[in-house]
């Protein structure tokens, strides 16, 4: 048996889950279980410990496949057999005709996070694997993401008082499949995972060829880990720089920056300072500007104008930027006139 297909034993489950289910856990948890092998192994592993905090298993029925309801009921039966409570969460209402997978993902997390907060849970655990991480990195590379996006899925992400946790993110999917087989935990295979109509399904067909050239899932995941470390350092530098560059005199709801100070920053830091300043004045509801657009404005227009001592007025990411007299003011973009 290869290491990549070795089942997890109780000790490894404990090492990965004790922080969230053991004596030092901050509170209860919700386990997101679709019925596939990854999340089934998560549920089975949690049941084996046993948990010292309240555990709720949740399955989202997206209503996209005729068999989805029966699969959710199968998860409920296995959860009952393992001694864990279970809830089925239904995504109801009209479904979009385009970007269906994105909409389904957003609905899934909304339902799961709502349940976690309703339960007073401290954490929501999902069973994303090394394979998922590699696919995510490739998808974001295809979409033109920068270093932050190529950092992939975070092992732990804090959402207010709730932690979104992926305890299996460094494990190959094959180990979780082997675990279910060894333990006799039944699971289903979603045909949508290999559906060539969707980008992720198409990339799954390509990945064996990339691995043959050396671009394995493990190397893609390691790249994501390195980029997350680098991004954390750049983010800290950008936060400090934004504080240092802030100047008085901004309009209410706006921000004023020392433009010359912005121009002497390393380009990667300056880019993040501009993005943070825009996010601050626009607020959390606006869609952030795409990285390519940020780069075009900063490197193609703003920095050259600062160097020339010139003026500039443009919009970016929902903000109005005005460069004049060595200062850069940012304010929310005024609403467009109807007609």
From Swiss-Prot:
One of its GO terms (biological process) is tRNA modification. InterPro entries: Rossmann-like_a/b/a_fold, TilS/TtcA_N, tRNA_Ile_lys_synt, tRNA_Ile_lys_synt_N. It comes from the Bacteria. SUPFAM superfamilies: Adenine nucleotide alpha hydrolases-like (SSF52402), MesJ substrate recognition domain-like (SSF82829). ATP binds at residues 34-39. One of its GO terms (cellular component) is cytoplasm. CDD domains: TilS_N. Its EC number is 6.3.4.19. The N-terminal region contains the highly conserved SGGXDS motif, predicted to be a P-loop motif involved in ATP binding. Ligates lysine onto the cytidine present at position 34 of the AUA codon-specific tRNA(Ile) that contains the anticodon CAU, in an ATP-dependent manner. Cytidine is converted to lysidine, thus changing the amino acid specificity of the tRNA from methionine to isoleucine. This is tRNA(Ile)-lysidine synthase. The gene is tilS.
């Amino acid at each position: 048996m290869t290491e990549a297909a070795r089942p997890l034993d109780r000790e490894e489950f404990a090492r990965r889950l004790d922080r969230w289910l053991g004596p030092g856990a901050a509170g209860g948890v919700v386990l997101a279980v679709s019925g596939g092998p990854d999340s089934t192994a998560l549920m089975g592993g949690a049941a084996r410990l046993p948990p010292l905090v309240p555990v709720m298993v949740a399955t989202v029925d997206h209503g996209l496949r005729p068999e989805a309801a029966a699969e959710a009921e199968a998860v409920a039966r296995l959860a009952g057999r393992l001694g864990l409570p279970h809830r089925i969460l239904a995504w109801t209402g009209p479904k979009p005709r385009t970007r269906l997978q994105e909409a389904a993902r957003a609905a899934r997390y909304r339902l799961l996070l709502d349940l976690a907060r309703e339960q007073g849970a401290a954490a929501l655990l999902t069973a994303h694997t090394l394979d998922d991480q590699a696919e995510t990195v490739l998808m974001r590379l295809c979409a033109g993401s920068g270093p932050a996006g190529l950092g992939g899925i975070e092992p732990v992400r804090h959402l207010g008082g709730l932690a979104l946790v992926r305890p299996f993110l460094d494990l190959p999917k094959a180990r979780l499949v082997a675990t279910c087989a060894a333990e006799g935990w039944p699971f289903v295979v979603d045909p949508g995972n290999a559906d060539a109509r969707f980008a992720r399904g198409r990339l799954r067909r390509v990945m064996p060829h990339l691995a043959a050239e050396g671009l394995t899932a493990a190397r893609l995941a390691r790249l994501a880990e390195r980029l997350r470390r680098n991004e954390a350092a750049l983010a800290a530098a950008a936060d400090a720089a934004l504080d240092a560059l802030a100047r008085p005199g901004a309009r209410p709801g706006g921000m004023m920056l020392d433009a010359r100070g912005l121009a002497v920053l390393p380009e990667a830091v300056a880019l993040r300072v501009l993005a943070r300043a825009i996010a601050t004045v626009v607020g959390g509801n606006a869609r952030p500007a795409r990285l390519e657009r940020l780069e075009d404005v900063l490197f193609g227009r703003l920095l050259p104008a600062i160097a020339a001592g010139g003026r500039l007025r443009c919009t970016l990411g929902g903000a109005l930027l005005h460069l004049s007299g060595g200062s850069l003011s940012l304010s929310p973009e005024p609403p467009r006139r109807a007609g």
